[in-house]
């Protein structure tokens, strides 16, 4: 997808050096407040000051700022004068009253040559300008009225697959068997999930452990002690499989998990403990064994779109040749796609007074995490957000988007989810991927700091501070395996159930996990714990990353570390809403600085002045790094979370970090 004018070249390419390139150099860095102010995304109605430095003070040039969003505007840049022997040029622009992405670069004609300074070719739209690059810098303009629930930026999230968390009493674990389905019910809570492969390579996912909502309710005191304030459930509605992403009935809690009353009771008791509940909304497809499609005849011989072209649900689906040739999700016949823009479907899911999204928020939940949000039409997302906020302005809409959500390209179109009209925020896979790459020595600290700074630049603060900062999930091998360097991806799927980490692998994986954990609990957004990660659960990819929680068999050292990090974050507001800057003191040490200054936090709200610095060392060797007093709001003393005291000498701190260790220091 183009950014700005269709490029005549790409940054990173080896451009031919011309005379003007040798005699004149243009400089601009989006992350430098001198060059761009304000930093980050800008609200509608705002102003942005952009500056450009020309290395050759004698160069008689006329410079232009080119701004593009469907149409092009060119702004002349005025010379400000010399700074350190270099000429500074400036342009100030109003961003207008329409939420959108603006793209800009700098151009001039000099000695008969067309000179361009554009963005680096890493597709972030941020960073230090590159001579000759026609890729544009990104400027996010978001709705000034856009805000996200405060509990998102303050929260610690915990993801639960209900079948695998805890068995409670009072539900019918054999319900699906009574409906004639072929299911497997594990008697041994601690055994591995089964892999039952279909001809198309999918897992039938028909083995169950009997976890339910009552089991979650019984464990609320544990979750409170862990420091959790948001519970995110994988789908809980009636469905054939154990994962429930093949919805059978949006209006019915799966009887294996409980019923609507059990959910209401859980929400009420969680609220009393300061916890909220978010549900998983799967609205791009349904199950073939659903009330709406009924391929298997579970709901009657003549019910559902598959069995009756006159069904009220028929228009929800796209049949190429009825009944067996229909559009389905990623080719899986068990997951027929829905037409989200069908009027009846929209009314049912979104618009009716008791629509699906409205009903479950009315029943006490605090919003939705949207499965495959980037496969849902933008008008559908806008209406979904409007309906949810109409029921409760404090409810959240969180999307599954795996890339930079400000300029995600899906199905050939660029989509921006950060403008304030669709999602509150997204799952922060870019952060997860960057930290894994750093800890596994695939990228150095400087590269990762730039990636994370670019996200912070592209995202509005309400969006950035509401991110779901996950380490593990049901879609990836357990984080312990990933960081141990042995996720089983090199062995046949049929052999992964018996795959175990060696003692040495487990030890180094645990050390890296604790580094990642510390960093996740130090940056903006909701840190999210995937159930069992805090207990040291290991496992390869699906279904083995979906093992049961090991009650009574937890890794106590890992559990203690998770509790400590949650307590640290919950006890220091600066780690929730302080300003944020990423640093790379050396290639093996990555850091983040959080600050409240002048009595305000990042949102301009009243807050005590505070500063915190988190550093993580991926090297096996001790590393000494240096911080200036200016880095930490002028503080002369830092105290780490483990009680070490650091005193500035000649305006600088010398900090020793042991191999594969990290620390968080607070200014005193």
Model-derived features: positions:
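Substrate-binding/active-site clefts of carbohydrate-active enzymes
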Residues: 161-230, 236-362, 384-390, 407
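Conserved, mostly hydrophobic/aromatic
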Residues: 52, 160, 223, 233, ...
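Glycan-association/targeting regions that enable binding to alpha-glucans and other polysaccharides
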Residues: 2-154, 158-159
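C-terminal beta-strand-rich structural cap/linker in extracellular carbohydrate-active enzymes
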Residues: 56, 649-668
């Amino acid at each position: 997808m183009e950014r700005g004018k269709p490029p005549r070249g790409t940054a990173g390419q080896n451009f031919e050096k011309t005379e003007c390139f040798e005699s004149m150099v243009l400089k601009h860095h989006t992350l430098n407040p001198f060059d761009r102010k304000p930093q980050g995304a800008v609200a509608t109605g705002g102003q942005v000051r952009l500056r450009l430095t020309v290395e050759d003070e004698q160069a008689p040039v006329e410079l232009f700022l080119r701004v593009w969003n469907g149409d092009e505007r060119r702004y002349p840049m005025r010379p400000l004068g010399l700074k350190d022997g270099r000429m500074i040029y400036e342009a100030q622009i109003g961003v207008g009253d329409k939420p959108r992405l603006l793209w800009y670069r700098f151009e001039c004609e000099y000695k008969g040559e067309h000179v361009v300074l554009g963005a680096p070719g890493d597709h972030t739209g941020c960073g230090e300008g590159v001579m000759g690059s026609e890729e544009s810098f990104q400027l996010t303009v978001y709705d000034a009225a856009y805000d996200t629930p405060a509990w998102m930026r303050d929260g610690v999230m915990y993801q639960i697959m209900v079948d695998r968390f805890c068995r409670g009493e009072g539900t019918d674990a054999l319900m699906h068997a009574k409906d004639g389905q072929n299911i497997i019910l594990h008697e041994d809570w601690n055994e591995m999930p089964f892999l039952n492969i279909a001809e198309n390579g999918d897992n039938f996912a028909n083995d169950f452990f009997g976890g339910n909502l009552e089991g979650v309710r019984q464990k609320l005191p544990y979750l409170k002690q862990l420091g959790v304030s948001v519970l995110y459930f994988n789908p809980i509605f009636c469905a054939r499989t154990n994962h429930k992403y093949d919805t059978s009935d949006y209006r019915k809690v799966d009887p294996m998990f409980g019923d609507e009353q059990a959910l209401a009771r859980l929400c009420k008791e969680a609220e009393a403990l300061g916890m909220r509940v978010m549900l998983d909304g799967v609205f791009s497809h349904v199950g073939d064994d659903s009330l709406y499609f009924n391929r298997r005849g579970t709901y009657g011989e003549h019910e559902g779109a598959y069995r009756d072209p006159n069904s009220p649900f028929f228009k929800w689906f796209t049949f190429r040749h009825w009944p067996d040739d229909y559009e389905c999700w990623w080719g899986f016949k068990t997951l027929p796609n829905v037409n989200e823009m069908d009027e009846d479907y929209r009314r049912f899911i979104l618009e009716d007074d008791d629509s699906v999204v409205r009903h479950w928020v009315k029943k006490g939940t605090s919003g939705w995490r949207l499965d495959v949000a980037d496969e849902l039409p933008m008008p559908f997302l806008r209406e979904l957000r409007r309906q949810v906020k109409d029921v409760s302005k404090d409810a959240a809409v969180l999307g599954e988007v795996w890339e930079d959500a400000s300029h995600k390209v899906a199905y050939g179109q660029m989509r921006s989810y950060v403008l304030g009209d669709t999602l509150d925020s997204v799952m922060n896979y870019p952060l997860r991927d960057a930290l894994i790459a750093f800890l596994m020595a695939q990228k150095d600290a400087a590269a990762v700091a730039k990636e994370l700074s670019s996200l912070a630049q592209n995202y509005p603060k309400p969006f950035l501070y509401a991110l779901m900062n996950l380490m593990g999930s049901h879609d990836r091998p357990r984080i312990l395996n990933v960081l141990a360097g042995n996720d089983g991806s090199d062995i046949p799927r049929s052999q992964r159930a018996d795959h175990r980490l060696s003692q040495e692998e487990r030890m180094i994986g645990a050390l890296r996990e604790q580094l990642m954990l510390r960093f996740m609990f130090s940056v903006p957004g909701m840190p999210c714990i995937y159930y069992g990660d805090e207990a040291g659960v290991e496992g390869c990819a699906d279904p083995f990353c979906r093992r049961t929680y090991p009650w009574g068999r937890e890794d106590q050292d890992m559990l203690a570390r998770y509790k400590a990090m949650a307590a640290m974050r919950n006890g220091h507001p600066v780690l929730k809403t302080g300003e944020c800057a990423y640093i790379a003191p050396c290639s093996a040490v990555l850091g983040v600085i959080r600050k409240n200054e002048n009595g305000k936090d990042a949102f301009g709200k009243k807050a005590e002045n505070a500063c915190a610095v988190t550093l993580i060392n991926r090297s096996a060797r001790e590393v000494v790094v240096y911080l200036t007093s200016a880095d930490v709001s002028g503080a002369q003393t830092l105290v780490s979370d483990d009680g070490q005291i650091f005193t500035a000498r000649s305006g600088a701190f010398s900090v020793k970090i042991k191999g594969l260790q990290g620390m968080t220091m607070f200014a005193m």
